[in-house]
């Protein structure tokens, strides 16, 4: 079991890796975890809509038109789960009596992304089965943004990272690692219907593992997350029925990736979506519902499985209030 611990630390990231991801740390944050964004090819850096916008680009938050809560669940092959819960709100303080000019608009978001995998086949040094193991990764977000001008907003997002492998230490306890990451974003809407955004993601993000509780002579190892740069653009035609989005993603260790998508909206009914996450197509839809006079949206996304794997399904509930 002890010899298996280091293998787990190295192996688990590959379960979340997309093609070309290389199994780098933090892969669960780069694979898409919400149905609307997933169906749009994971291109969302320049879209100021919904609570999830604060994770893709925190600078979009002052441009939200309502408060929103969201629940999202991903159904993945290989006994994996990927879930997200979040809340976001625009902040528009009222001007005090006697003050000139408009108050500075802002936005706030919080969220939690949880990734888990179970039924990992544990083996001893002779290759004999010992037990089934599991792993969970978590990212807790808080994002804040300001809009200093009509056409420009800036934002920052801090995230606490926590990785846990239970039942693997000498006393059958958990091996854990924690860290902190920082995202920085800029957003602009220079023309009607057109928006652009840039996000610098996973600055400082890393896992530091110490295996003293597993081995007689443990080691300390650090795995840094790839530092991501995303630039995106979005355009909604004047009659509002079509949204076109595109992102270009690059990092300090990975090859560039592109993300494109389109959303066709039928007013008050729903939307159809199609996207391309680099070389992986995605499809989905949204249904608009009224619950107690408030807008609720049910979103679904479908992504074909890689090679022999089953397809991926993502379902999200969004509530505006």
Stretches with model-predicted labels:
Residues 1-4, 150:
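Positively charged n-region of N-terminal signal peptides that target proteins for export
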Residues 4-13:
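Sec-dependent N-terminal signal peptides
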Residues 6, 34, 63-66:
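A short, polar/charged loop/turn motif at coil->beta-strand junctions and beta-hairpin connectors
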Residues 18-37, 74, 81-321:
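Outer-membrane beta-barrel porins/channels
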Residues 37, 44-49:
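Intrinsically disordered, low-complexity, positively charged segments
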Residues 42-45, 67-78:
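Short strand-turn segments of transmembrane beta-barrel domains in outer membranes
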Residues 52-63:
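N-terminal periplasmic accessory domains that precede
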